[in-house]
């Protein structure tokens, strides 16, 4: 049986006896997701193949033993050692900081209000979500990122930055003021519900969107997140052996490929909108069966004539990449397409506006 694991609730960072810093979260979303996953699996071929587990912290479930970030780290270590765990939905609100007043820690003398003010030192806590796919790159990871009254672009970029740093496969970014929920994918596409925007402007004027619509938009996005997870989480993972060498010169590519690439770049097909200098999209051309030249990962594709490309060799489940950069994430899709459609030898995927 394969496991889909959902972790929810908030954690505490102990300061002194009866005093803690906390990340307030009470498990509602984690419970909802658990029910939604089970509802989606019922009656499908995956129903008997998958088991949904929900782990809640003590803040969300009084019977739980999960209290601190350390407890969540211990839980993750157990989950990562369990090969039946295939998907982790990390909805847990972890304390971003470890709090301390002095070196005596939690078991120091109890603080007394009669002693007046104390200075609290906050130290950034480790980002536990980042450990998941560093240890188990085969796990499908869903993360969550919160913003406060951010613009839609700021919200997207914040969620995207978190996705890239933690290697999440999907991220749900939600804003606590605008109530906007955006699902972000590794291909840097945002999926959102239009229900709030559609109802903000009625009868020729703007109006306040009610709580019921905000709740419906949130539930719609959670359902979409579940559907996208189930559609993507069982895709195969192939580890690539990377050999660092010189890039493949763009000028060695077929003329047709170079002409199309220059056209796409000229039309703004590779948009730098993620705040990190990289561009979404991918491209490549076939050299021979199982051998092709692909775009580079973590670069600006508009500079391909300067940066060059990466050689990729596929032999069964073995993939070897040679160049100055790893190939684009889309290189695996390119390999599958070249194999399925041998009559084609060039692929260009961008975002033409």
Question: Language-model features: where?
Answer:
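Short, well-ordered loop/turn elements at secondary-structure boundaries
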Residues: 1, 279, 287-288, 341-344
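A cross-family phosphate/adenosyl-ligand binding-site feature
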Residues: 1-227
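Active-site metal-binding loops of divalent metal-dependent hydrolases
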Residues: 10-11, 297-298, 352
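Long, non-catalytic terminal segments
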Residues: 219-329
């Amino acid at each position: 049986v394969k496991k889909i694991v959902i972790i929810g609730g908030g954690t505490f960072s102990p300061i002194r006896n009866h005093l803690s810093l906390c990340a307030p979260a009470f498990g509602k979303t984690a419970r909802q997701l658990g029910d939604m996953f089970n509802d989606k699996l019922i009656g499908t071929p995956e129903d008997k193949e998958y088991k949904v587990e929900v782990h809640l912290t003590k803040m969300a479930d009084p019977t739980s033993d999960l209290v601190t970030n350390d407890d969540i780290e211990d839980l993750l270590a157990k989950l990562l050692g369990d090969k039946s765990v295939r998907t982790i939905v990390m909805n847990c609100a972890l304390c971003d900081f470890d709090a301390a007043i002095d070196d005596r820690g939690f078991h120091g003398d109890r603080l007394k209000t009669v002693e007046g003010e104390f200075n609290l030192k906050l130290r950034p806590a480790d980002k536990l979500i980042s450990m998941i796919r560093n240890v188990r790159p085969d796990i499908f990871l869903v993360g969550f990122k919160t913003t406060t009254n951010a613009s839609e672009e700021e919200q997207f970029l914040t969620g995207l930055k978190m996705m890239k740093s933690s290697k999440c496969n999907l991220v749900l970014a939600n804003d606590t003021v605008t109530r906007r929920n955006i699902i972000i994918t590794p291909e840097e596409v945002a999926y959102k519900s239009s229900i709030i925007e559609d109802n903000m402007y009625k009868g020729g004027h703007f109006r306040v969107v009610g709580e019921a619509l905000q709740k419906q938009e949130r539930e719609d996005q959670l359902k979409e997140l579940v559907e996208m997870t189930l559609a993507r989480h069982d895709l195969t993972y192939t580890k690539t052996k990377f050999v660092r060498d010189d890039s493949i010169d763009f000028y060695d590519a077929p003329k047709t490929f170079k002409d199309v690439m220059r056209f796409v770049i000229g039309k703004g097909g590779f948009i730098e909108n993620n705040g990190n200098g990289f561009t979404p999209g991918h491209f490549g051309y076939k050299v021979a069966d199982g051998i092709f030249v692909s775009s580079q990962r973590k670069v600006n594709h508009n500079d391909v004539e300067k940066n060059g490309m990466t050689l990729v060799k596929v032999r069964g489940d073995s993939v070897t990449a040679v160049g100055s950069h790893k190939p684009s994430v889309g290189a695996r899709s390119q390999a599958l397409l070249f194999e399925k459609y041998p009559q084609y030898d060039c692929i260009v995927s961008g975002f033409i506006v």
